[in-house]
């Protein structure tokens, strides 16, 4: 998910005779090639989950849903059947004159364990399209950076649960010379806070439930980045309704979330982040001293040392008001962008060249090669998925909120603790290569929260996140196995840190994100097994 603005082998010498006696060593010509090897370790078994394209009958097709039906064999550039799905605009109220509508794309699952649930996915921004999540993170087909065509996604969340990707509220623009805005959702700006966003989303979702006969289904709400506000506020609003026929919310999960003030999430942990990934930030001694001096002078160094502790010593004090002289995050971004002009704030291990992205945004900034088109801006694509024929952009540069200001408090202050109390499981996950929002900022936020009768975690997250080994499958959808992170749970809140993972967890670490979803849904009870 984009958003939060547009910002980043050594070989041992071996004696030839000794090498000859070691049959497992490879020649230099063989470096990079993988030999198949048997593993006596836990494995994923996908055999019980039939591919979505094998569906013989449409499970949700009826008179009410027919207008939303998508022909899974006629998605432009997709050379396989994506299966049963429904897409289009749904109004946010039952008013006959309602002009505000949210765009959705709904995929029923073939997994029998999913029959009594629905999972909602929201991207963030604010002002970024959830179709990015569908196409490049966790949908049934993927078209990722630098690839020629869409491919089937073996880690599609539709293999586990019924999924609906919903584009957040987006204002239309009366100026025809400018893009209509993010995604396909329609309406003039009217939201001033997350409470307003939640109210409108619940209006949409009630209509969605009525249309697809999903009454009483357990609801899981998942999102990333600025959805660290959307998800808990929407869940809180659903709990407050006390109406399980329409709003039977079960649990929530947020990836790399915006849950606190920017100073905590970005400025305070910036210099320790650079130190941890020193090889990716090859600064000279002069600049390294400069950013350390900035962090010391602005109180960031002492703040980290004193408050990122387990258990916490008490409520975290407010930081002094931010000044340009204390903007160490931007100083680092500007400096590393000189060394690595393709620096990606969403995944800091990225280097040049910039890869082609069919959504036009392959890193810290927009980029589309000459002659290329943004996929969802194509008329044939829009017709195939029941979208309005209009200009589509992945992220809007125009304000989503009235006057460009979200008047809500950060979700970690009050809303997330309330949601944790009312849910069987709440998960906060964070990629360790994310610079746009830094994992230690999320941990600081958790250590400042009070829920379940205590503040923060009593222990630092340290348990291994284990992903079962699996067949490599297609080279186009490789994903890791083994220990891919660390995790910790206390009082129904689970924190997961994903190793070698950027801002968009399901994009950069699909197998681990799939595993975490299994835990959220209650399909597994231990992330270390």
Curated annotation (Swiss-Prot):
<comment type="similarity">
    <text>Belongs to the peptidase S10 family.</text>
</comment>
<keyword id="KW-0645">Protease</keyword>
<dbReference type="InterPro" id="IPR018202">
    <property type="entry name" value="Ser_caboxypep_ser_AS"/>
</dbReference>
<dbReference type="InterPro" id="IPR001563">
    <property type="entry name" value="Peptidase_S10"/>
</dbReference>
<feature type="glycosylation site" description="N-linked (GlcNAc...) asparagine">
    <location>
        <position position="440"/>
    </location>
</feature>
<dbReference type="InterPro" id="IPR029058">
    <property type="entry name" value="AB_hydrolase_fold"/>
</dbReference>
<feature type="active site">
    <location>
        <position position="434"/>
    </location>
</feature>
<keyword id="KW-0121">Carboxypeptidase</keyword>
<feature type="active site">
    <location>
        <position position="503"/>
    </location>
</feature>
<keyword id="KW-0325">Glycoprotein</keyword>
<dbReference type="GO" id="GO:0004185">
    <property type="term" value="F:serine-type carboxypeptidase activity"/>
</dbReference>
<keyword id="KW-0964">Secreted</keyword>
<keyword id="KW-0378">Hydrolase</keyword>
<dbReference type="GO" id="GO:0005576">
    <property type="term" value="C:extracellular region"/>
</dbReference>
<protein>
    <recommendedName>
        <fullName>Probable serine carboxypeptidase ARB_06414</fullName>
        <ecNumber>3.4.16.-</ecNumber>
    </recommendedName>
</protein>
<feature type="glycosylation site" description="N-linked (GlcNAc...) asparagine">
    <location>
        <position position="284"/>
    </location>
</feature>
<dbReference type="GO" id="GO:0006508">
    <property type="term" value="P:proteolysis"/>
</dbReference>
<feature type="glycosylation site" description="N-linked (GlcNAc...) asparagine">
    <location>
        <position position="448"/>
    </location>
</feature>
<comment type="function">
    <text>Removes acidic, neutral and basic amino acids as well as proline from the C-terminal position.</text>
</comment>
<feature type="signal peptide">
    <location>
        <begin position="1"/>
        <end position="19"/>
    </location>
</feature>
<dbReference type="Pfam" id="PF00450">
    <property type="entry name" value="Peptidase_S10"/>
</dbReference>
<feature type="active site">
    <location>
        <position position="225"/>
    </location>
</feature>
<feature type="glycosylation site" description="N-linked (GlcNAc...) asparagine">
    <location>
        <position position="377"/>
    </location>
</feature>
<feature type="region of interest" description="Disordered">
    <location>
        <begin position="171"/>
        <end position="191"/>
    </location>
</feature>
<keyword id="KW-0732">Signal</keyword>
């Amino acid at each position: 998910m984009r958003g939060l603005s547009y910002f980043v082998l050594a070989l041992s010498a071996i004696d030839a005779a000794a090498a000859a006696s070691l049959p497992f060593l490879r020649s230099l010509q063989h470096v990079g090639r993988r030999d198949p090897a048997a593993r006596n370790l836990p494995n994923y078994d996908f055999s019980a989950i039939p591919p979505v394209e094998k569906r013989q009958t449409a499970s949700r097709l009826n008179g009410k849903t027919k207008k939303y039906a998508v022909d899974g064999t006629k998605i432009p550039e997709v050379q396989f059947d994506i299966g049963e799905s429904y897409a289009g605009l749904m109004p946010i109220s039952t008013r006959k004159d309602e002009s505000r509508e949210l765009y959705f794309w709904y995929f029923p699952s073939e997994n029998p364990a999913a029959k009594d649930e629905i999972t909602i996915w929201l991207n963030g921004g604010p002002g970024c399209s959830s179709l990015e999540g569908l196409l490049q993170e966790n949908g049934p087909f993927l078209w990722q950076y630098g690839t020629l065509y869409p491919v089937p996604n073996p880690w599609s969340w539709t293999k586990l649960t019924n999924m609906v990707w919903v584009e957040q509220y987006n204002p239309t623009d009366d100026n025809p010379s400018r893009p209509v805005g993010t995604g396909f959702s329609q309406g003039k700006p009217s939201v001033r806070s997350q409470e307003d966003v939640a109210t409108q989303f619940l209006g949409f979702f009630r209509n969605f439930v009525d249309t697809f006969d999903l009454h009483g289904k357990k609801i899981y709400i998942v999102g990333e980045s600025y959805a660290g506000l959307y998800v808990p506020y929407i869940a809180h609003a659903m709990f407050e309704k006390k109406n399980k026929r329409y709003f039977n919310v079960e649990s929530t999960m947020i990836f790399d979330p915006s849950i606190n003030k920017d100073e905590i999430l970005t400025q305070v942990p910036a210099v320790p982040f650079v130190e941890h990934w020193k090889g990716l930030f090859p600064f000279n001694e002069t600049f390294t001293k400069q950013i350390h001096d900035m962090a010391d002078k602005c109180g960031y160094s002492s703040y980290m040392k004193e408050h990122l502790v387990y258990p916490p010593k008490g409520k975290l004090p407010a930081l002094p008001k931010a000044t340009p002289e204390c903007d160490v995050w931007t100083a680092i971004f500007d400096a590393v962008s000189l060394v690595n002009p393709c620096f990606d704030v969403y995944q800091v291990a990225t280097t040049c060249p910039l890869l082609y992205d069919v959504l036009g945004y392959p890193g810290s900034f927009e980029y589309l090669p000459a002659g290329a088109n943004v996929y969802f801006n194509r008329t044939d694509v829009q017709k195939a998925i029941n979208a309005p024929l209009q200009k589509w952009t992945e992220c809007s540069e125009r304000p989503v909120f009235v006057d460009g200001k979200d008047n809500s408090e950060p979700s970690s202050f009050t809303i997330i603790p309330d949601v944790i109390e009312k849910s069987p499981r709440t998960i906060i996950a964070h990629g360790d290569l994310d610079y746009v929002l830094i994992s230690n900022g999320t941990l600081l936020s958790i250590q400042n929260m009070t829920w379940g009768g205590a503040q923060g975690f009593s222990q630092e997250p340290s348990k291994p996140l284990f992903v079962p080994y699996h067949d490599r499958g297609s080279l186009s959808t490789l994903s890791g196995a083994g220990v891919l992170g660390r995790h910790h749970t206390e009082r129904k809140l689970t924190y997961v840190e994903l190793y070698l993972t950027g801002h968009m967890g399901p994009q950069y670490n699909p197998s681990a994100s799939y595993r975490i979803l299994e835990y959220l849904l209650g399909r597994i009870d231990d992330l270390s097994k």
